[in-house]
Curated annotation (Swiss-Prot):
Cleaves the N-terminal amino acid of tripeptides. It catalyses: Release of the N-terminal residue from a tripeptide. Zn(2+) 2 binds at residues 140, 174, 379. It comes from the Bacteria. The active site is at 80, 173 (proton acceptor). This is Peptidase T. Its main location: cytoplasm. Belongs to the peptidase M20B family. Zn(2+) 1 binds at residues 78, 140, 196. Keywords: Aminopeptidase, Cytoplasm, Hydrolase, Metal-binding, Metalloprotease, Protease, Zinc.
Amino acid sequence: MDKLLERFLNYVSLDTQSKAGVRQVPSTEGQWKLLHLLKEQLEEMGLINVTLSEKGTLMATLPANVPGNIPAIGFISHVDTSPDCSGKNVNPQIVENYRGGDIALGIGDEVLSPVMFPVLHQLLGQTLITTDGKTLLGADDKAGIAEIMTALAVLQQKNIPHGDIRVAFTPDEEVGKGAKHFDVDAFDARWAYTVDGGGVGELEFENFNAASVNIKIVGNNVHPGTAKGVMVNALSLAARIHAEVPADESPEMTEGYEGFYHLASMKGTVDRADMHYIIRDFDRKQFEARKRKMMEIAKKVGKGLHPDCYIELVIEDSYYNMREKVVEHPHIIDIAQQAMRDCDIEPELKPIRGGTDGAQLSFMGLPCPNLFTGGYNYHGKHEFVTLEGMEKAVQVIVRIAELTAQRKS
């Protein structure tokens, strides 16, 4: 495990922040740098069929070291970091034997406090890797990458029995494009696991059904002094639309299996306003009902408008709950749970209040639940990971490979 931390620190030193609204994939040059580094490292380790596609998907195979018809399985992580917070000049702090209390992040006023993040109370005595308060850390998902790379090394060095192990590193997961250019046939695994979760023990195979809603509102602007009966204020229409959206079904009011409507952005003038919502729900019927609700609201608010003024609503599905695909193959979850228990970890099955590459891949024919990385507070300057959590993730990956080798196709 001595190289696990070294690998992680190496990977987070590269700025791989992805960028939304960009046609090219990967969306940023920094992602290519990490992909080329990983390709070189995989080749040096002796993996075969190492390929890097023109869309930035890196794949490789660790060949089986035992005979028999053992199913090929995969492990997947993404190279990009969130657009929500800078990933440039990441300067990790290593806090050994955490004794509790606030951790100063760099030389400013930022702290990592157990008052705000009570999970710290459970991590006494562990080694924490934090930010310096100026950037995110990049544990999402460079912890996953380091864990997969280290697990490959452990399987080789200890000659642990395993079948074919496929690995893949994808770009632009944070902007929803990670799986769009993933060649499932070329990957050629029976099932896979993304290593992109949170705290130790998390095992996730349920995620939101997701859709985006874009609303274009065209009004009519005239001088306010002569506006009666003529002006149609697009901003007022936008306000009326949002007032119709259930206020108690927003992200800040929901948790667990509860879905939500989220107004992510709004801009405009009297003439023209644009609103962008995201809709999330675990239940497919409720998901469809939420989309209908948005259409009904737009129709209600737009009723009776002058023909030159209108409300246009476009709904686009983003991804679906992988549960309906993964539950068709219960052994995938059973093996992961057994692997965790064999590593003295109690599995924590919980829904992902978000999405992963695995959600899309599951609907592309590759069932793909999500394993923990040992990281917390992703997408911001309070992000951190524990070295012990990362070590546990490596152990679980290795044990999954070992258990799968005991299972014949």
